[in-house]
């Protein structure tokens, strides 16, 4: 399955020193790269991710997901005390669960994002002081910041760690079509309130690429866009 769908590729950003609370990123999908079954993930963190998606049927969505600390591929198996809880959700946002690649809480907004337009996302990660961490995702569109959702993850005490982005095809039938995405203008805000620009990143791919099963992947820097 993973060989047939192609290698997912990632940018792991070099975070500034200190407790990072917010991560800001921008994405541009050009018209020729707006393909079905593609996830243009913008704001990843050690416990989840957020980005825009074009589904297998061509729907456009904004997704924000947080993994449970309980290891399983079936969300039904997660004990109640280890479930990711939703604290808030934005207008027209759907809340659900996901599985198969870990499990946890998920939110999505049906939003007709347009190829050729730059979109912005902001994710906040902050410990609540009671043994859980709160994750909040925002998406900027139509001239305003839209709340996607705010989740609480139990048994977690962390700030924003593991900032990254990825490009993924999730349907093997579409893996023959080349696709790319541009990420730019990455910033993090520390818990102290200071904003720091991210100027470094490391390119990587999943096991499909690292094992040599597929060679049709690449990453590059183009005038501050990656």
Which sequence ranges carry the predicted segments?
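Secretory/extracellular carbohydrate-interaction modules
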Residues: 1-93, 108
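Residues that flank catalytic or metal-binding motifs in active/ligand-binding sites
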Residues: 21, 60, 117, 133, ...
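Short beta-strand segments enriched in hydrophobic/aromatic residues
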Residues: 27-31, 68, 125-127, 141, ...
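Short, aromatic/His-centered strand-loop micro-motif at the edge of beta-sheets
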Residues: 96-119
């Amino acid at each position: 399955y993973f060989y047939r769908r192609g290698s997912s590729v990632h940018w792991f950003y070099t975070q500034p020193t200190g407790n990072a609370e917010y991560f800001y990123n921008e994405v541009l999908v050009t018209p020729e790269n707006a393909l079905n079954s593609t996830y243009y993930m913008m704001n990843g963190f050690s416990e989840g991710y957020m980005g825009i998606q074009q589904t297998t049927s061509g729907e456009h969505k904004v997704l924000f997901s947080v993994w449970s600390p309980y290891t399983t591929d079936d969300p039904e198996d997660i004990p109640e005390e280890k479930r990711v809880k939703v604290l808030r959700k934005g207008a027209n946002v759907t809340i659900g669960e996901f599985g198969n690649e870990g499990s946890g809480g998920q939110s999505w907004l049906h939003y007709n994002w347009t190829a050729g337009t730059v979109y912005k996302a902001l994710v906040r990660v902050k410990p609540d002081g009671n043994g859980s961490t709160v994750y909040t995702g925002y998406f900027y569109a139509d001239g305003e910041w839209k709340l996607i959702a705010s989740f609480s993850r139990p048994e977690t005490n962390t700030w924003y760690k593991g900032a990254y982005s990825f490009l993924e095809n999730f349907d093997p039938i579409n893996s023959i079509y080349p696709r790319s995405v541009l990420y730019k203008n990455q910033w993090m805000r520390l818990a102290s309130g200071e904003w720091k620009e991210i100027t470094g990143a490391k390119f990587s791919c999943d096991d499909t690429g690292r094992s040599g099963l597929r060679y049709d992947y690449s990453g590059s820097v183009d005038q501050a866009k990656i």
